[in-house]
Amino acid sequence: MQILKDIEAIVGTKGILTGDDVSNRKAGIWIDEGIKAKAIVRPKNTEELSKVLKICNENKQPVVPHGGLTGLAEGAITQAGQIAISTERLNEIEGIDTVGRTITLGAGVPLEKAQNVAKENNLMLAVDL
């Protein structure tokens, strides 16, 4: 499929999963079946993410965001023709401003890691699940 080739040109071979690499991944921590999607795209920065979403939009390709796949809201259930956009590689601590008391995190930073970074810098992450 051309759209998948175009996306791979942006994210590289490590940034896109297809076939068994998709279906062998669990759809969530509470779901035993595999993910049903055309592909899982794993951008490593917002520039790649933006380019991928532009291609998907131009091709009217449905996408579903994938975060931690806890399934608490069941908002990340994909269907066979859709593309999952995973945040797993968007996992960098981008900046810590102790004066402004802010931390800039990638969308894929696990909550526990974010809380630990905040604590190490005498800050508090105001999210509690």
Task: Set out the residue ranges of the language-model regions.
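Short clusters of hydrophobic/aromatic residues that line enzyme substrate/ligand-binding pockets
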Residues: 16, 25, 72, 93-96
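Short acidic, glycine/serine/threonine-rich loops at helix termini
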Residues: 74-79, 115-117
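N-terminal accessory segments
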Residues: 1-29, 58-61, 68
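Short basic, glycine-rich beta-strand/loop surfaces that mediate nucleic-acid
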Residues: 80-87
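N-terminal glycine-rich flavin-associated loop
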Residues: 7, 31-63, 87-129
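Active-site cofactor/substrate anionic-group-binding motifs, chiefly glycine-
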Residues: 55, 60-65, 70-77
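Short glycine/serine-rich loop/turn segments
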Residues: 30-33, 77-79
